[in-house]
Structure formats: structure tokens, C-alpha cells
Amino acid sequence: MKPIFSAEQRRAAYRILAALFWFAVWQALAMAVGQEFLFASPLKVLHSLLRLLSDPAAYLTALLSAGRIMLGFLLGAAFGILLAALSSRFALVFHLASPLVAMARAVPVASFAILAVILVSSRFLSTLIAMVIGFPVLYANVLEGIRQSDRKLREMAAVFQVPFFRRLVSLHLPHLAPYLRTGFAAAVGLCFKSGVAAEVIGLPRGTIGERLYFAKVNFFTADLFAWTVIIVLLSIVCAWGVLKLTDLCFSRLAKI
């Protein structure tokens, strides 16, 4: 006998039930606190979110912050991939890069942001912090992917003098694809969290960080939650776009 619901329908139902459960927990906490300015209810946050979505200035704010953070992601990804390639080829580069990567992973975002805001304009703070936080993720993933590649295939390509571009397209990149996708997905989320945190510290004009800080000091808790929802949505959309673009690039390369 065939099941009434397919596996996909059951998974969707579980997601909806999980979301409803946590919304109920949220509502219960809001009712327990009993003060909207301390802990806003889901309906209050939804009202604030709809108000923000009807404001053209909110879209400009979101695009400005997302653009700067994604620029930092791209710079960090490029630097991490290049450094990983060099580290896999030259032991000296690997040993020189190891302390840099360890520091970028261990030092708190606040410390980086406070130091950076002294040295650079607050307008570029989220870009710089996103780059610093994002590059170790891509570095580690790509380096691990290179180390896990088939050495015999690489040696055979060298023996038969396969051109570098052909080796890159047919051998190296297809193997690195899952490592890159995983790294991109993780790095985008980290870049948004760290980038917005840097904006809250540097307070560049017209950014999400500035709006969050304004909501905090004025106890506009519903707006604080609403902007947090927007940050999460921006992160999800940007990660989805990066992964789709990555898949498209690899599918095009496979046809070369």
C-alpha cells in the first residue's frame, strides 16, 4: 500500500510543525516577560517587518549593507582560494599562512572591528571584517580538497603533459566543487553575522548596523527583531545565489 504522503511532503510538514513550535515558544516567552519593549511578540515583530518592507529607505539600507558584506565575501574567497593553492604547492607559504589563518579564526569580531575602525573609514568596515572572517573558511576547505585529490591522476596528467588549463578544468575544479560549495555556504553566513556586527560597532550611515543600534538604544525591540529577520533572509538569498552561480559555472566548465 502506497503511503498517503510522499517523503517530500512529510519533510515539508515537519519543517512547518517545527517552525510553529518555535513560534509558540517565542509567543510564550513574550507573554511571560509581559513587556513588549523588552521582548516583542511574533505579531509585533511581523507588524514592524511589514512596516519596514513598505519603506523604500529600508531596501536601500539592506542593499547597501548586503553589497558591502558580499564584496568582503568575494575578496575573502579569492584570497582564501589563492592562498590555499599556494600553500598546497609551497611548504613555506603553508607555514607562513598558518598563524594568519589561526588568528583570523580565533580573534573575536569585536576586537577586529574596534582595531579596524581606528585604521579605516567606517564605510569599509563591514567589507574588511567580512573578508577577514570569510577567507579562513575557503582556505581550509580548498586546501583540504587539494590534499584529498588523486595524486596518481595528477602525476599521470604531468607525465602526458596535459596543458594547465585542461588539467584545471577537467581534473582540479570538478574535484574541488563540493569543497567550494560547502565553503561558500558557510562563509556567506559568517560574513553577514560578522559584517553586521562590525556595522553596529562602526555605525556607518545608512546601514543595517546603524538601524540595529538605533533600535537597541531606543528600546524598539520589535524593530530589532524585524531587522534581524531581514539579515537572515539576506544571508539565505545571497548564499542561494552564490551556490546557484557556482553550479552554473561548473556546468559550463564541464562542457568545455
Predicted feature descriptions by range:
Residues 91, 178, 182, 226-256:
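C-terminal transmembrane helix and the adjacent membrane-cytosol boundary/short C-terminal tail
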Residues 71-101:
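Transmembrane-helix boundary motif in ABC transporter permease subunits
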Residues 130, 183-233, 243:
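Non-cytoplasmic
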Residues 141-180, 212:
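Short cytoplasmic-facing helical segments at TM-TM junctions of multi-pass membrane proteins
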Residues 102-137, 144-145:
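Generic hydrophobic transmembrane alpha-helix motif, especially the helices
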Residues 4-7, 32-74:
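Periplasmic/extracellular loop-to-transmembrane helix junction in inner-membrane transport proteins
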Residues 128-132, 165-197, 238:
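Transmembrane alpha-helices
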Residues 1-20, 240-256:
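Transmembrane alpha-helical segments of polytopic membrane transport and secretion proteins
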